[in-house]
A protein has these predicted regions:
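Beta1/beta-strand and adjacent pyrophosphate-binding region of the FAD-binding site
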Residues: 1-13, 35
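Glycine-rich loop(s) and the adjacent beta-strand/alpha-helix scaffold that form part
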Residues: 163-215, 228-229
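Residue-level recognition of phosphate/Mg2+-coordinating polar/acidic sites
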Residues: 23, 42, 63-65, 73, ...
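Short beta-strand to alpha-helix junction loop
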Residues: 77-87, 104-124, 173-177, 205-208, ...
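Short hydrophobic core segments
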Residues: 6-8, 37, 139, 158-175, ...
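Conserved N-terminal glycine-rich FAD pyrophosphate-binding loop of Rossmann-like flavoproteins
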Residues: 39-71
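A conserved short coil-to-beta-strand element within the FAD-binding core of flavoproteins
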Residues: 135-148
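Glycine-rich FAD pyrophosphate-binding loop
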Residues: 6, 22-52
Length: 463
């Protein structure tokens, strides 16, 4: 089979690349075929689950603000960003009949909050431009031959083409088809692959999962994934107490080898995986990379980031006096009164885990052989509110990581065209590249803009 341009991978970046190539060929009056080879039964499976199915498809920030959320390859992305900025991405979808809405944090969604609308728009745009989408087309190998390429399929078929765009994504959510195939092909063609690791993933605190987690890690002592904790691993009693709690506007600081490396304020979720949410995800990139490199990592959560330790200490003491003097507290034990106090300082469902992890808030005084007195340490409560430490035992792997960090080195790719510096006619776009960003629409924007630039230049270079 022959096709002038073959796009391998029918995800967000691949579909945008195919549309960009085909539509530019139509505008130029060139008769050429663009074909997408997608290994799964349907295209854009990962897009379908983005944002829990709501699909935050871009972030409408201008470059200066947007770029601060790109964690790798920021200078590389700039040209593609200006070629297809977020405003153009929004316009593309609206032109395809999908109404959009922009929410807090400049995050753009389909007004329906259905990811299927995003997928339908991409697929319909491709079909309208004459793109051929072949599903269940599993590529085995990409060969550079003469002035073109030979793309070999698992079923024995092959495509001969002038240009190839590799848009196979990374390793995240492999059930959607992202299994790292593009890394092997790129490497075989001479490209350097920056070591990969999961990013925007759950960090698993020590004691959050069952004790068998430690045994599992020991059995993987020689493996690259020895700190990977499968999300399905059962929760411990502590994990059960924390799971499902969502914290709004807390402080979170990341320490590596006892050195502060990052700090921010925002929302944190405790899930069946561990510590997630927008802020937890943002910290995960540096955390996972450090863990993989053998460093000790811990997080410190500040439940009261708006006040100083001195201020919260005085607040705790004042509240305790109110609780202690309340007639309804007269017959209550100290621990019961402490629970009432904590309920004035944090969500009620957080109290059991907070107490379990901060036993120092109770001081037991032995007055005689038979008499003891329990004291509530108010200073310790205040300190724990400001410094709640979570030692990180591991992380959830690619099976539920939002993106893959690492990939095809951007040193081997021309930023203004997305073409390989090593193999003429070969292009890369999307997550297969060593480019990743924060959660909030940044990664899909990068997928779209790098895909659009790759498709445009692949079409332009056709003779």
């Amino acid at each position: 089979m022959k096709s002038d341009i073959v796009v391998i991978g029918g995800g967000a970046s691949g579909l945008m690349a195919a549309y960009s190539a085909a539509s530019s060929l139509v505008k130029a009056g060139k008769a050429a075929q663009v074909t997408v080879l997608e290994k799964m039964p349907r295209p854009a499976r990962k897009v379908m689950i983005t944002g829990k199915g709501r699909c935050n498809f871009t972030n409408v920030k201008e470059w200066n603000d947007f770029s601060s959320h790109v964690r790798s390859g920021v200078s590389f992305v700039k040209s593609s960003f200006y070629n297809l900025p977020p405003s153009a991405v929004v316009r593309f979808f609206e032109d395809m009949g999908m109404k959009t809405v922009v929410e807090r944090g400049d995050r753009a969604f389909p007004v329906s909050y259905h990811a299927s609308d995003v997928v339908d728009a991409l697929v319909n745009a491709c079909h309208g431009a004459g793109v051929k989408i072949e599903c269940e087309a599993v590529v085995e190998e990409v060969k550079s031959i003469g002035n073109g390429f030979e793309v070999l399929l698992q079923d024995g078929g092959k495509y001969l083409c002038s240009k190839v765009i590799i848009a196979t994504g990374g390793l995240s959510y492999p059930t959607t088809g992202s299994t790292g195939d593009g890394f092997a092909w790129a490497s075989a063609l001479g490209h350097h692959i920056v070591p990969t690791f999961p990013s925007l993933t759950a960090l698993v605190p020590k004691g959050y999962k069952i004790k068998e987690t430690e045994d599992i890690r020991q059995s993987r002592a020689d493996a690259d994934d020895r700190f990977h904790v499968d999300r399905s691993t059962p929760l411990s009693e502590l994990g059960e107490k924390l799971c499902g709690i969502q914290m709004k506007n807390v402080g979170l600081s990341l320490y590596v080898q006892d050195n502060l490396v990052d700090t921010d304020q925002g929302d944190v979720d405790f899930t069946d995986g561990g510590i997630e949410g927008p802020l937890g995800f943002r910290m995960s990139r540096k955390a996972v990379k450090s863990i993989v490199n053998g460093s000790k990592v811990f997080l410190v959560m500040d439940l009261k980031p708006g006040v100083t330790l001195t201020e919260i200490t005085e607040r705790v003491k004042t509240l305790w006096k109110e609780v202690d003097k309340d007639p309804r507290s007269a017959r209550l034990r100290e621990k019961e009164k402490c629970r009432i106090l904590l309920g004035k300082l944090m969500p009620w469902d957080l109290i059991p885990a907070f107490v379990e992890m901060h036993r120092e808030i109770y001081t037991l005084e032995r007055r005689s052989r038979t008499e003891t007195k329990l004291w509530i340490n108010l200073v310790s409560i205040a300190k724990a509110l400001k410094v709640w430490r979570f030692d990180i035992a591991g992380y959830v792997g690619y099976e539920r990581a939002v993106v893959t960090a690492g990939g095809v080195s951007t040193d081997d790719v021309v930023a203004k065209t997305m073409e390989s510096r090593l193999v003429s006619g070969l292009y890369f776009c999307g997550e297969v590249l060593d480019v990743d960003s924060d959660t909030g629409g940044y990664n899909l924007q990068t997928a779209f803009c790098t895909g659009a630039l790759a498709g445009l230049n692949a079409a332009k270079s056709l003779k």
